[in-house]
Amino acid sequence: MVSVKPLPDIDSNEGETDADVYEVEDILADRVNKNGINEYYIKWAGYDWYDNTWEPEQNLFGAEKVLKKWKKRKKLIAKGLLEPFDAEDNEAKKMKREKEILRQQRQKRKSELTQLSQKVKEKFKKMRKKPARRIVTIANDEEEEDDQTMDEDAFERKSMQGELKERNLTDKTSTLSTSFGETSPDVNPFYLSEWPTVTDSILLSKSLSSDAIPLKNGEIKSTMLMPSDSDNSVPGIQNSNNLENTGAFVENANSPQSNTPLSTFRHSSPLSLSPVITSDNDVANSLFFSNSTPLPSSLKIKKEAPKLETHTILVSDNSGSLTKQDILSYFAFIKGNIEVFFLKSPKKDKVCNMAYIQFDSIEQAKLAYDKGHPSWHVTLVKGKISTDMEECKVSKSILKTTPSKKANARSVSFTQTTTDTLSESEKFASNVDLDENFDFNVNVTNEDAKQLKKSVIGSSWTTVNNDWNSVSKSDQTFENDGASKVVPAGNITLNSDNSLHHSISESEDLSSASTLSDYFRFVLRVGKSLYYAGELSFDISKLKAETEHQQLLRSLVSCKQVDVLRFVTSQYLEVFGTCLTKVLSGSLCIRSDVDMTHFKNILNRGNGAGIVLGSNYTLLLFTEDNNALMNLYDCQGQSNSPFWMVIFEPLESILVEWSAKNLRPKKPYHKSQSYLSYLLQLGHIDLHKIGAFQATQILIVSKQPSPEAEELEDTFREAAIPTFRGLEIPESLFLSQNVFVFLNVSLEDDFDQLQFLTLAKRKSCKFFLFGLSLPLKSPNDSHVGTDFKKNNEPLDKLTYSQYLRPMFPKGGVVSVTLSALIKTPRLLELISPFLEIKKDSWILILPPSIVDMVKSYFVTNNPDKSLLEIQNLLNTLQRYLTNPALKNVTLYQDWDIVIDDSADVSLASTLQLYQKKNYDKYRRFVLIHELKNELTPVNGLDIVDYDEFKETFMRAIGLK
């Protein structure tokens, strides 16, 4: 059980890892990461809990036994017999521990620097009290000449020192010695008493420039040599050729004591240092020197906690290799959504190396800022960044670098301006609502289109729109400030039916960006074969270079030559190497009544994938947010377009028979037809015996935007039905009569957390579950196979279906707690008439150990209870559990039992779990309980005593 695992050492320098062979002790959890790869949460042998890591299966060499053990335990977890390991909580504790270690290290360093500062100040005070030493004249002629020169130098230095005293700056000067306070015997005392050292010059400055460049380990690099004639200038430093080894040493950031000597020098002109210290107390807390050069020309500053409260950071990379995938993978340890917004380069021939990164919370942004990056510059940015390119135009003069003629320093400033004045065409384009308007009578001009960038594609790809040299210069227009203008996608005109049409002349180069749609990036996939459900296969290697398929490319820019396969959310496209396998093996629908503009809009909103069937090609469409597909097809590069389109050989001829069976009808809606029937005809949605209905209000509830929810909403809007979609539903919308609520399958495990799923709402509303189902074990299964393992079944037996299932249809479930049985031993006999009348719609469900629970209670807590009552209760329980005629009496399964210290609480939690699994069978879930022993209310459960049950349920059907 060994595996290669690089374990980071928190106490070592950042970036260092120790790659070695480690033993896998246990697997605690598993997950599918953003790239669609299955990972396991590993407990390593000989390491503590804070060394647990997520590892892909390929890293677990020789751990087959542990994997088998984990698969067995996972089955028990799925059945509720074992509690799952909380990996997220463990990761949070790890992060908290790392922060605490870093805090202690910072505190220790701060304490050491404080002591150092105090010693320096005390030493300097003693030195200031010493009188200046006089120069003794020696008879020797050569020594007289040397002494005379030294006297002149001393006079010059005294004059400068007096000038500094007049500016009230000398009280802030200090010096450093070899042992932090002890004078080296090799150092001339004259220089120590009469001349300010390099450190003195630094301490005279008030603060370091906030524009300094961030470095690795959260430090900031600032160049000290900045000649200036400002008033606060102080004597500077000569270059290393004039160094005099005085034996003075300064503490280094990476070692206890540096071997780099510091000395004092003269310079022909004063030098100005960037402000570095905000107060006197910050002197020792912010300064230490780098050992990278003999001179202290690179000054490192300890990174203090940022005071700026923001969700956004700005990242730049001088190497120019910054990509979205690099950013997302580097900050993958941060939970939640991460939005990346790249800035356009001011120069059209260069790729911009700057990007805004926006997090869900301020704490996440600070965490990313604190971590930094070895080669990136990370800066906090005030405010949130809008990703809407039409409504927020950002000036491209983001990074201005001004070289100084007097020094080798650069001052870097970040500026962001928003263009308030838009052209009329831009204002019009930004107001177009793609959700509502399906006919676009818009005159598209050069200013309205979007610019295409070069796409960087992997070696197995050829790109259609990567030849910028073939675009005429007249088509490439840019403003002076870097704002991009549109390269038109061919000559765009309006047909007689007011639809957009791209006209292409025979002489135009079809591989150029100017002849293709500006909304997509097209790539050709070659050299691979796909297999569909074990039956359909073809060889894509026959597809040649795009220049030999001009007709194919012409058809790509037309909006009228495609049929669209139904939308599929990315969560069901785990590995799109088998993407078409999973799409085509289900009862999904080919659509021929949707235009491409509407399709692209829904695809963008839903973050899913879709397939376009043409006579000469097949297209796979997805957005950049679909990480699994982006990684699988090696899609790279930045562009204004949010879409990728992968071109395959035509599938239409292969799927003729399959398409004919699933072709979506173009039947218009008529008021004489029920809405639900119309919906079923459009989508081939399975429904269990529900009659026609006439809804006055449609509520669509989805955890996140999905193509299923988008399409369902559009269907009802086309039928002119009031429709609302979201998670938080206003209470006023439930006041209408005949309200229908559609819940997406993504919420199936969270029904008990939806506040509107109350008993009162179930009386006045009708609920339905919709969406693309998970794989079923067989087409006849009526429930989603939650314990289905994809490795246990061949692909040709998987069934994916789009369905609409009623929720909480009728009937109910009743259960009784132990306290209720103790109070009323005849409880089961009293409610038996109700169960007999409702035997077709209601059931009584009991724990499998109810008899033992009753015996144990009376023996332990109430031994004086009448033996006759106890025996009668036990006989009743035994009869209910063993009589085959009582078909509506059943027991919980062992794996459905939720264990708790209290038997009543355990039963309430078990009934809540049972409700989540049987929402499509029963409307009411009733727990008869002794109300003196209060239970926490559970959404969707009726917790009543016997009297209330009799009043509410039994009398409603004529029982007294």
Curated annotation (Swiss-Prot):
Keywords: Cell cycle, Chromosome partition, Cytoplasm, Cytoskeleton, DNA-binding, Nucleus, RNA-mediated gene silencing. Residues 22-74 form the Chromo domain. GO terms for biological process: chromosome segregation; heterochromatin formation; pericentric heterochromatin formation; silent mating-type cassette heterochromatin formation; siRNA-mediated pericentric heterochromatin formation; subtelomeric heterochromatin formation. The keyword Cytoplasm applies. One of its GO terms (molecular function) is DNA binding. One of its GO terms (cellular component) is cytoplasm. Gene3D superfamilies: 2.40.290.20, 2.40.50.40, 3.40.1010.30, 3.40.50.11490. PROSITE patterns: CHROMO_1 (PS00598), CHROMO_2 (PS50013). It is found in: Nucleus; Cytoplasm, Cytoskeleton, Microtubule organizing center, Spindle pole body. PANTHER family: CHROMOBOX PROTEIN. Ago1, chp1 and tas3 interact to form the core of the RNA-induced transcriptional silencing (RITS) complex. The RITS complex interacts with the RDRC complex via interaction between ago1 and hrr1. Clr4 has a role in mediating this interaction. Interacts with dri1. Component of the kinetochore which plays a role in stabilizing microtubules and so allowing accurate chromosome segregation. Has a role in the RNA interference (RNAi) pathway which is important for heterochromatin formation and accurate chromosome segregation. A member of the RNA-induced transcriptional silencing (RITS) complex which is involved in the biosynthesis of dsRNA from primer siRNAs provided by the RNA-directed RNA polymerase (RDRC) complex. This is Chromo domain-containing protein 1.
